[in-house]
Amino acid sequence: MEAVNSTTSGFSSVLAGTKYANVNIPPQIDYVIEAVSNAGVWTWVFTLVALCIAYDQIAYIVRKGPIVGPAMKIPFIGPFLDSMDPRFDGYHAKWSSGPLSCVSIFHKFVVIASTRDMARKVFNSPAYVKPTVVDVAPKLLGHDNWVFLDGKAHVDFRKGLNGLFTRKALELYLPGQEEAYNTYFKHFLKMTKDAGGKPVPFMHEFREVMCAVSCRTFVGHYISDEAVTKIAEDYYLITAALELVNLPVILPYTKSWYGKKAADMVLAEFSKCAAKSKVRMAAGGEVTCIMDAWILSMIQSERWRKAEEKGEPHNVEKPSPLLRMFNDYEISQTIFTFLFASQDATSSAATWLFQVTAQRPDVLDRVREENIKIRNGDPNAPLTMDQLESLTYTRAVVRELLRWRPPVIMVPYVTKKAFPLTDDYTVPKGSMLIPTTFMALHDPEVYDNPSHFDPERYYSGDAEEKGSKNYLVFGTGPHYCLGQVYAQLNLALMIGKASVMLDWKHHATPKSEEIKVFATIFPMDDCPLTFEERKW
């Protein structure tokens, strides 16, 4: 027993008491051991927090390297509070600070590419980057949505969508667009009348009309007027949930929570539309919307496969590319991405178009003259694709508007691996890399007086040729916007049709020229307007 006691005492820790018997410990270590032994819970907490702050700062400084950015990061959150209320002036200052700049928000290290060449390099480097959106986006759009595909899988899926935006296809969608504009232009007149002729902020109305036009273009009349109105009203919640800085998780009664509920509603409605379209297309119905065109391609592909199985492929024309039969939910997801890609951008462009044409009666008069002429004096006459394409001045107005007030000012990507963007800077793997389009579109070396709205650049000038590499409104590279021709023709149809059916006045405020950032850009005062019926 004494031997056991002797052995046990021989292996007692030096921390068992404040004195260490015959162990000779330097006083510095003695002090540290004493402090650790007597440390309380809060001491440990503060020490851990200090270590985390130090790690956060060191990681930021190492990632930042030689590019422009704050010397130190606000612990953990970075400029998160500023990002909750994004200011265009703040973004512009960041872009102007250098070709590359950075910030760090929570765990995200963000590099901003501001020049034309830097932006183009990002757009054209699929080996290093892939498009990304906010953390909550897969929960809204669906984790298996095609927009999250990369490489060959993305290219192959995209090939099956290209046929939906050909000239022939776009002409089929025109009647649905005209119908929606006729309905909403009457609504604009009623709004002004109900307001007693006083100006009403129309930004939210433009969001609603562009959403309705998109729904009619994408899913036709498979969706009810009530459902279109509901989607148009609720899509604002989806946009708010997908802002660049937002909570990465869905908590009850947050923006993300409301956005998820709205997204689920849209997906459910579009799934119903897909089921109806399959029945109608299989019965030989005519194509009236994008969903019809895509499902018809699936049906034709299925017929060819069955003919091939029977050894009779020569009896059926082989579609190119061959598509599989997607289920209703997959179709719904894809159509939802079209709405996601178009809604905010076209809403922004529509708002600025109505504002700037009201401010520039010389421009509006020329648009009106061109459009009434092509309609042979009948303001209610629908347009064919040939007529729409012949509106050279109207299309120049749209082209310049998109340069002057580009709806999408930043396009977020994530680096798949370390990206040597310049000779002296490599963007770390996993960083968010954001090319901006605004600086390229306002480059004074390419565009004279770039801050001035001047449609003549594209009507009689050389902006198309000089700015061929600068016009990044729809991106470039493998992820360029599929619907860029559709978007521009749709906007030309809208403003041209409005010019012959309506008169409108912009009631300027001190904030009319200030830019509000809400996914895209809008006038800060939401564009107060009044409308009257055009009398010829």
Swiss-Prot record:
Enzyme Commission code(s) on record: 1.14.19.41
Cell location: Endoplasmic reticulum membrane
Signal peptide bounds: none
GO cellular component: endoplasmic reticulum membrane
InterPro entries tied to this protein: Cyt_P450, Cyt_P450_CS, Cyt_P450_E_grp-IV, Cyt_P450_sf
Keyword Lipid metabolism: yes
Residue stretches spanning the membrane: 41-61
One function term, GO molecular function aspect: oxidoreductase activity, acting on paired donors, with incorporation or reduction of molecular oxygen
Keywords: Endoplasmic reticulum, Heme, Iron, Lipid biosynthesis, Lipid metabolism, Membrane, Metal-binding, Monooxygenase, Oxidoreductase, Steroid biosynthesis, Steroid metabolism, Sterol biosynthesis, Sterol metabolism, Transmembrane, Transmembrane helix
Main location as per UniProt: endoplasmic reticulum
Protein family: Belongs to the cytochrome P450 family.
UniProt miscellaneous comment: In Fusarium, the biosynthesis pathway of the sterol precursors leading to the prevalent sterol ergosterol differs from yeast. The ringsystem of lanosterol in S.cerevisiae is firstly demethylised in three enzymatic steps leading to the intermediate zymosterol and secondly a methyl group is added to zymosterol by the sterol 24-C-methyltransferase to form fecosterol. In Fusarium, lanosterol is firstly transmethylated by the sterol 24-C-methyltransferase leading to the intermediate eburicol and secondly demethylated in three steps to form fecosterol.
Full protein name: C-22 sterol desaturase ERG5A
Organism in which the protein naturally occurs: Gibberella zeae (strain ATCC MYA-4620 / CBS 123657 / FGSC 9075 / NRRL 31084 / PH-1)
